[in-house]
Amino acid sequence: MLPERHIGAVNWVGLGTLYGKECRRFFKVWLQTIVAPTITSMLFLAVFALAIGRVMPEIGGVSFLQFMAPGLIVMAMMQNSFANTSSSLMISKVQGNVVDVLMPPLSPGELLIGFAMGGMSRGLVVALVLSLVMLPFVHLEVHHFGFLLVHALGASLMLSLMGLLTAIWAEKFDQLAAVTNFIITTLAFLSGTFYSIERLPEPLLTASQFNPFFYLIDGFRYGMIGHADGSLAVGAAVVVGCVVVMWLICLKILIKGYRLKA
């Protein structure tokens, strides 16, 4: 007879198992989850370098490619953090094995941490690999490590939570694809990834300042090249506020079991 196992305030074994499952899931298909987004981002860099890289003036005292590189890194990080949590939970729901995650003695908070950390890990791994691949072509440096780290963690965590929230809400892959294509991709492309928002006319300039993705990219860019288009204090407040709000929403939904429990 197996001895009785006592679980403390936190089920560390269960939490570690869930996190490990999420990480093994994307490492198992690394060509799709790590190499593919890296190649896509490098293609963006190559196209812009060949098309307008030499004729574009410096932005913030750096070349256009140096300005664009941090934006591409954060965009890849955000998209892959979102994809990891959303696809993992969505596939479990569609295949009917989400019960394997819900039945173990894991609290809603532990489920949230496990899924969110898995998404963050994929986003950060993609960002690291992409940065290393970019090094021979673009001069990358760290201007302010604190801003770089905070906005990298904030971007990956925010999009992990958004992915989890989307997967809970969606009932089929069409709905998940709609959010990915019309919300995540749109906000990422209109957040100053490829341009400085200072070049935008009104009212597009004002509208960009209501895009939370802009502050993620702007803060990360400042941490890397020392240039920011917006207020760093406002950006940090927006990032923290969005993460806290989304965390509380996800936790509340997991507690209620909305669209997860019969």
Question: What are these language model-derived features?
Answer:
Residues 1-262:
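Hydrophobic transmembrane alpha-helices and immediately adjacent juxtamembrane helices
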